[in-house]
């Protein structure tokens, strides 16, 4: 059963029907809000540049702020990024889960520059939630950013997202209230010695331990 308010997005409970509708809407260029294992996100189809522009506009995100892509599985990372030894170790250890890996962008990757704020890099994550993975399995890597206005607190549930983002979002997949945890930890693997750019769901000490165990040098505190 769906609900809607004046100027608000439709809300459908997470499940096969909601995911099928989300896929159709994304292919048509709409913006959809989805649950993840960290916070709710809003997503667009990577193949549609106009939709990506609407993604930035929906949350008033400045163009100098990069947007990561959610993946169905670790295999999709190699489509857009160059997966080096450190990234391979971290993906095997922490995906699916709350870690975004920043990788060098593949020269042949079809990726709008705005998603990386003009840098030759790409941020990728496999979330520990079936809804975004199902969408990415069907559509490919999914540009996704947190479902809030830029610089504001994260929306806590589907109704709040629908009210906050209004007509900018066509559908909200309702996965229940968020757990209130942090966003993903961001690890930069484009430098010689990986470094944490944002502390989040996965503590730096655990990341350092994984790299130490693999014999990979890094600049992450906690080892």
Task: Kindly give the residue locations of the regions a language model identified.
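Active-site-adjacent structural elements in enzyme catalytic cores
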Residues: 1-223
